[in-house]
Amino acid sequence: MLEDALNQYFGFKTFRQGQKEVIESVLAQQDTLAILPTGNGKSLCYQLPGYLVDGIVIIISPLVSLMEDQVYGLQKQGEKRAIAFNSQLDLADRQYVMQHLQKYKFLFLSPEMIVQEAVLHQLEQVKIAMLVVDEAHCVSQWGIDFRPEYLQLGEVKKRLKAPVTLALTATATAQVEADIRQVLLAKNANVYRYSMNRSNIGLFVEQTTDKDASLEDYLSRLGGAGIIYCSTRSKVEEVYNKLRQRYLVGYYHGGLASDQRKTLQQQFSQNKLKLLVATNAFGMGINKEDIRFVIHYDLPDSLENYSQEIGRAGRDGKQSNAILLYQEHDEQIHYFFQRENKEERLALERTVQEKRKEPLTPLQEKWQQKMKELGTSFWLETLKRNEQQKQEQLQKMLAYIHFTGCRRQFLLAHFGEEAQENPYCCDNDGIEIAGEEQLPEKKEAHHWQERLIKIFKDIN
């Protein structure tokens, strides 16, 4: 029985919603698309079958930090045959891995890495048990994080003799689902879509003129562990420095070294830190069940990203909170990035049309490489469509903030779902913050006279 294997390899007695059906489908050699809400344990859907079949499990992942988190999680469980094959490995280590592929059970690669001819050639020589495409929405030009390299994975699959393929994502509209199926999966693929509604998470938006005061107010009322999301690394450090004197807090962003990130994850998981101020680089691959709240200090750029980030709260099923702090003109930083992106794209178009040789920015150089690989007109059209989409996503995010009806209904409708009865719903439905014990503050050393007075007060 699958439950026996689950207990043997992971120490769990029961599956979460959707896990067993997806695993059974994969073990029956059926291509499978699993759309599971954040926090539902998507990684188990390939890890458990990986132990039950012969051969290597290849996992395509878009982010180095996500790969490292997944490998670290497997290693903590005692699995030594997992490795992230990416640019962080030096040349000698990469050569060693390629020459000893049969030693590994779980091999994590970026889409850019697996399409390299030398890598593909080596993979063709070994038995591939399963091809897993994590964050599969990246394959769609209508997805939040379109990555053109994902479009090449269909050809990669053919080269690897079409192993059974599992596509995983937490957010997919009907259009994104259709694109995933077309590029990655066989026509008879099984699709398992589960509601992204997290009924135990209350949804709150506060429109404020003083975010720091609002943040302090919430932290004084909330208990348990929490994440505070900010949009930039500098803002993360600024907010962290305001909180560090009073709370057990750390900060996390993509600029930290790999060992620093691992240490922070460990401290947060073990409750040595109760708060983490972070960019959205933090959260993917995090298995902490008892995060009681997620606060967005800055405005997210899309409902898709917002949904994924708040989904890191309350994975144990207990009441939790998602709080978004909004100050007038918060959207300006997103408009700025959108304008900057468009100007760089237009400048590159002019350079191409006029066949001029001019120095390019790092971003333009990256785009130029994509134009060589995928065709100039295709790539420029993709960039234009991406600009339009980001504008639309931001408008939807702003509409959510100003919405006066049920926020949960608004969020679910965006993903094509109908609202369900929800006793702990949102601020517009009149609920109040569900708090636990207050956050522990840092203990300051008191003067001996103050300590003595406190002792006498306590006795009396």
Model-derived features with residue positions:
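C-terminal helicase lobe
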Residues: 223-229, 233-236, 247-250, 254-257, ...
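Helicase motor core with emphasis on the C-terminal RecA-like subdomain
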Residues: 2-9, 13-45, 49-55, 60, ...
